[in-house]
Structure formats: C-alpha cells, structure tokens
Amino acid sequence: MASYHVSHDSYQSPGPSPLYQPIIEAPPPPYPPTRTRYQDYYGGYGQPHPPPLRPYRSDHEYYGDGEYVGCFPFLRSCLTTLCCCWFVEQCCFRSRY
C-alpha cells in the first residue's frame, strides 16, 4: 500500500458550491421595535401586567396559630372531593354515629 502525502501548502479550499445559493443576511429588525409581550393589557382581562408568580403560601400564612384543629388541617390539603367527603364522615362526624 502506497501512502499518499498531501501538501497543505498546495491545498486550495473549494470555491462556493454551485448547488447552494449564497446565504442572504436577515433583514434588519423593524424600527421602532415591536411591542413587548405584556405591553398591552395582559390576556384581555384588563391587567396592565401579568399576575405575579407566587409560590404556594403556607398554612400558617392563611390560618395563623391554632385557629383550626382536628380534621381541618387535613381538609385544607385534601386534593379531591371524594377524599374530603370520606375523611369528614370518618373523622369529623364520628360522634354522630
């Protein structure tokens, strides 16, 4: 097997390919710039800004210390009505039976 040595000095980069047209630059952005996303009223509800993002507030922030006891802490965090109804019957109204 003969190994061929290519001299880097004599290597010429190929010209532009005839298959592809030269890339046209993107047109400049419109001036004046377009409105930002929330510049007009947000979502059609008459809010000048999007509603602030807040994490879920703690139960302490809503209820303070010891306002609700018994089954209410469970009911506050209950996700489904079925779960709440079962717990109310089993826990809160146990004294009726």
UniProtKB/Swiss-Prot annotation:
The chain crosses the membrane at residues 68-88. The keyword Cell membrane applies. Its main location: membrane. It comes from the Eukaryota. Mostly expressed in siliques and, to a lower extent, in stems, roots, leaves and flowers. One of its GO terms (molecular function) is protein homodimerization activity. It is a single-pass membrane protein. It is found in: Cell membrane. Induction: Induced by salt, heat and drought. GO terms for cellular component: plasma membrane. Keywords: Cell membrane, Membrane, Transmembrane, Transmembrane helix. Residues 1-27 are annotated as: Disordered. The keyword GTP-binding does not apply. Residues 15-27 have a biased composition (Pro residues). Homodimer and heterodimers. Interacts with CYSTM3, CYSTM4, CYSTM5, CYSTM6, CYSTM10, WIH1/CYSTM13 and CYSTM11. Binds weakly to CYSTM1, CYSTM2 and CYSTM12. Involved in resistance to abiotic stress. Belongs to the CYSTM1 family. This is Protein CYSTEINE-RICH TRANSMEMBRANE MODULE 7. It comes from Arabidopsis thaliana.
